[in-house]
């Protein structure tokens, strides 16, 4: 049994650290130094047949020269409910092949099936046990009411493990081993009817931490999407909420799906869906626990504005010399399609790409001078 003292030590809010985090954040920034003007993966791409509503969220990582995309495919009706979690691969970032379906949701729209909708597949490698883990969200689903948003509610985080040992097992097949986080007696007041809507684990020292998210979807209009931290001694848990410091003070109203990257100096950066127009959000941390106020990274400008809404970044992929590849999903902007739920257009989701550079703040302005 984990003692209260150990929990407090793992999640303690050291007073001087937020000041140090803020100081570090002011010294660094992410800059887009190459924009790809068209989406690189759409419902019209090879291998995407039968994917009615496109792609949303997930993670891309690079392993021995191959890019691996784990994403949510919105394959049918009900929209945002009938889903597949898929694995795609690419050697050049631009041309993709679908490798497999990892899991498929039931599409049940009665509110009874806890796996009616599946979202946000996040592959994480357990170095100690030499196995890939796949964390993803499973929701109950039902028609919305004037008061409640029920399309995706009571999210639970499932953990699956690859049956193939070692890094070569990244493609699975994956076998479910259980739920690691859900709304219940251990929840905090800021957690709402949506349940746990995202989960991303990362290593800090000899412990694991994870961002997890939620929203009070029991009352429309929905005012807040927030994230907080949980920690565990091992990747397989048990996962314990950092209630003393939750929710994270990164964004005022909307933050979803943070994905963390460890930088060369041992500090941390996370990218996330922020609702920023034509962009995504990012935040820095010195210790992986205390995070700076978020900033916007604009990923679509000029002729490259193909999305009506830029949605979810899929993680920063180090390419060397402080350059990162950043894939993201967004809804393609089709003329004549009005926004519906939460001002989002039900147009096909696609994947875009930018190259990003980590710089000292103001470096470009100084170079111009």
Residues covered by each model-derived region:
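N-terminal secretory signal peptides that target proteins for export/translocation
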Residues: 1-5
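Short glycine-rich, acidic/polar surface loops and turns
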Residues: 312-315
């Amino acid at each position: 049994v984990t003692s209260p003292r150990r929990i407090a030590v793992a999640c303690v809010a050291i007073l001087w650290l937020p000041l140090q985090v803020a100081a570090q954040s002011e010294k660094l920034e992410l800059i887009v130094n190459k924009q790809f003007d068209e989406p690189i993966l759409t419902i019209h791409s090879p291998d995407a047949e039968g994917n009615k509503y496109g792609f949303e969220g997930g993670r891309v990582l690079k392993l021995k020269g191959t890019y691996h995309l784990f994403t949510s495919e919105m394959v049918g009706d009900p929209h945002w409910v009938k889903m597949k979690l898929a694995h795609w691969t690419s050697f050049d970032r631009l041309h993709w092949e679908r490798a497999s379906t990892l899991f498929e949701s039931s599409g049940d729209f009665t509110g009874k099936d806890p796996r009616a909708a599946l979202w946000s597949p996040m592959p994480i490698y357990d170095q100690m046990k030499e196995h890939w883990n796949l964390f993803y969200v499973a929701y109950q689903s039902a028609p919305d009411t004037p008061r409640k948003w029920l399309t995706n509610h009571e999210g639970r985080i499932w953990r699956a493990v690859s049956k193939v040992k070692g890094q070569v097992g990244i493609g699975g097949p994956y076998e479910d081993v259980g739920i690691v986080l859900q709304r219940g007696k251990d929840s905090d007041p800021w957690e709402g009817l949506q349940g746990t809507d995202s989960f991303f684990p990362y290593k800090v020292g000899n412990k694991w931490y994870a961002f997890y998210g939620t929203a009070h979807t029991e009352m429309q209009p929905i005012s807040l999407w927030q994230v907080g931290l949980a920690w565990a001694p091992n990747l397989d848990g048990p996962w314990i909420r950092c209630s003393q410091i939750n929710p994270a003070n990164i964004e005022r109203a909307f933050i979803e799906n943070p994905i963390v990257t460890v930088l060369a100096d041992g500090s941390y950066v996370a990218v996330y869906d922020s609702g920023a127009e034509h962009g995504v959000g990012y935040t820095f941390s010195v210790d992986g626990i205390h995070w700076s106020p978020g900033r916007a990274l604009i990923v679509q400008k000029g002729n490259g504005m193909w999305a009506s809404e830029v949605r979810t970044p899929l993680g920063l992929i180090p390419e060397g010399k402080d350059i990162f590849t950043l894939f993201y999903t967004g809804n393609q902007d089709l003329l004549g399609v009005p926004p519906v739920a939460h001002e989002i257009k039900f147009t096909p989701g696609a994947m875009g790409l930018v190259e990003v550079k980590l710089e000292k703040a103001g470096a470009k302005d100084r170079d111009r001078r």
